[in-house]
Regions:
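Extracellular adhesion/carbohydrate-binding repeat motifs centered on closely spaced tryptophans
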Residues: 1-235
């Protein structure tokens, strides 16, 4: 097998030395060289093609090290940790930030090669999605990964995902490639329903209908399922 050693020839357990971590983007600190993991319990052998439930070394990210903050990490055939990418593993897709930590919940990526931000489901309200009041949402693609970090964490897709936000449970939609309908603050019509930043726009329950702005001069009326109201309707 492959083993890691420091400059004194002493076998390295756990993480290899990281030359430096770029903090130019505070929301996504990134290791500037590939990170590898050597098992401290297996004679120091390089861990290839495996999931690791670990906290990072202090030179990767000090806060997580100090807190003993565990995350999932995934290595490739060379033992290098996946970083800054959405990657298919055993038929499912997972998100990894610039250090290699798996991300769950709402995740923003600039294409699939630069992690931008992660948000828990209850971090924002429905109004925040409608108004686009979320850091990075205009310039990055929105995905949703199962919040069950311990047992799943994979990309979720479909037109009717029930997600509990700060102000209640709402319906979201994500394309087969994982990108949200109505991505990047652009209203999107899908099967006669409207979505913005993944959120399906629905009527006010009290009135049974709502108004959706398509552009500066155009509005549509939608019912409680987000469908366009056509013809005559008693209100």
């Amino acid at each position: 097998g492959t083993y890691g050693f420091d400059e004194y020839g002493i076998m390295l357990p756990w993480w290899t030395q990281v030359a430096s971590v770029s903090n130019a983007d505070k929301s996504n600190p990134t290791s500037d060289i590939p990170t590898r993991f050597y098992a401290g319990y297996d004679g120091g052998s390089l861990q290839r093609n495996v999931w690791l439930w670990m906290y990072p070394s202090d030179n990767l990210i000090q806060d997580d090290f100090n807190d003993g903050e565990y995350s999932w990490w995934r290595t490739d055939q060379n033992g290098e940790v996946y970083q800054n990418k959405i990657k298919k593993v055993n038929g499912r897709y997972y998100a990894f930030d610039g250090l290699g930590r798996m991300q769950t919940g709402f995740v923003l990526f600039d294409t699939r090669s630069t992690f931008v931000a992660q948000y828990d489901m209850d971090a924002w309200s429905s109004e925040d999605f409608i108004e686009g009041n979320i850091y990075g949402i205009e310039k990055a693609d929105l995905y949703f990964f199962s919040p069950d970090e311990l047992n799943d964490g994979s990309m979720q897709t479909g037109k009717e995902l029930e997600i509990e936000l700060e102000d209640g449970v709402y319906t979201f939609g994500f394309k087969s490639d994982g990108v949200a309908y109505g991505n990047r603050n652009r209203l999107k019509k899908v099967n006669d329903s409207y979505y913005i930043n993944g959120l399906r726009l629905e009527a006010d329950e009290e009135y049974g209908y709502g108004v959706v702005r398509e552009d500066d001069d155009s509005y549509r009326v939608v019912n409680a399922n987000g469908k366009t109201v056509t013809g005559k309707k008693k209100v």
